[in-house]
Design a protein with these regions (language model features):
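Core SAM-dependent methyltransferase catalytic element
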Residues: 239-300
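N-terminal auxiliary segments of SAM/dcSAM-dependent transferases
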Residues: 1-33, 38
């Protein structure tokens, strides 16, 4: 992502100075789960494609990736209708998945899917900003937490509470795998006036929220507030070109891995905000890589 694009994106965002009135800001934030429930009522299981790309991006999801002598346990937060779950269960026969969402309707779609069996998966309703995960999942029992386009649906002031909730069920050495919308993404730049609630937070026409992350914000949430160790934290860029429609723009995502401390040395490293020695890749806030995977876009 070159400087010319960044400057152009900043200029577009700087022109959007109007924000949604405070009454409506509070309403949209308080009714986030209600509006997503309506979304799934309208679209059922037909809106998103199954996410077959996740184990390519995150090696921890591949069969044979060893965390311990026990079979791996994964929690998918914001599971929706199961688009992440089904490909992973099919490819990784040893994994067990907990799956939660704050939309009761979405969880019902997961439970009624022909591939659902509680021998391998348990779906439940949970608002991770306020409902304790340990009420359903034993403390410090989960190897992997996946958060794929989830934190962007949460108001910024509630994101730290969600991180703290996740930390309670992570094993020592357990990992959070995250991919979400990044700052200056095409979807952010396409919002019209009247959709902005605050910096980087917007409301779609259907009332659902969308927050656009910087790598610095992710570091703040998971390292500063969550005391996790940063293994990766970068932007993933996909360029979109359509000469017929004169479109030349970029989808930008934030992708990161964080790890729960294993021992006192790791805890000290987490508190200092440093990366684990010998970890997976470098955590350079302004680094970018190109990704050819088809992406999802929700914008009006």
């Amino acid at each position: 992502m070159d400087n010319a694009f960044v400057d152009k994106a900043k200029d577009v965002l700087a022109k959007d100075t109007s924000v949604v009135p405070e009454f409506w800001q509070k309403k949209y934030k308080n009714e986030a789960n209600k509006n997503w429930d309506k979304f799934y009522n309208r679209n059922t299981t037909n809106f998103f494609k199954d996410r077959h790309w996740t184990d390519r991006e995150f090696e921890e999801l591949r069969p044979g990736h060893t965390f311990s002598e026990e079979k791996p346990v994964l929690l998918e937060v914001g599971c929706g209708v199961g688009n992440f779950i089904w490909p992973i269960l099919e490819r990784n026969p040893d994994i067990y998945i907990y799956a939660c969402d704050f939309s009761p309707r979405a969880v019902d779609f997961v439970k009624t899917n022909e591939n659902y069996t509680e021998a391998r998966c348990k779906a439940f309703v949970c608002d991770i900003t306020k409902d304790r995960l340990v009420d359903t999942i034993p403390p410090h029992s989960v190897d992997i937490v996946s958060a794929i386009f989830v934190f962007s649906a949460l108001p910024p002031e509630k994101q730290a509470a969600a991180v703290a909730n996740i930390v309670e069920i992570l094993k020592p050495g357990g990992r959070v795998l995250l991919r979400d919308y990044g700052m200056y993404d095409l979807a952010q730049l396409r919002f019209k006036a009247g959709h902005k609630l605050e910096d980087n937070l917007y409301v779609r026409q259907d009332g659902t929220l969308s927050y656009y992350f910087s790598t610095e914000r992710l570091h703040e949430l998971f390292v500063r507030y969550g005391n996790l160790i940063e293994l990766e934290n970068e932007y993933v860029v996909k360029r979109l070109v359509n000469l017929k429609k004169s479109i030349d723009s970029e989808r930008i995502f934030a992708q990161a891995k964080f790890q729960a401390p294993i021992d006192a040395g790791d805890i000290e490293a987490a508190m200092l905000g440093t990366k684990l020695s010998g970890g997976y890749g470098s955590a350079v806030p302004e680094s970018y890589k190109t990704d050819g995977e088809e992406s999802e876009i929700l914008v009006d």
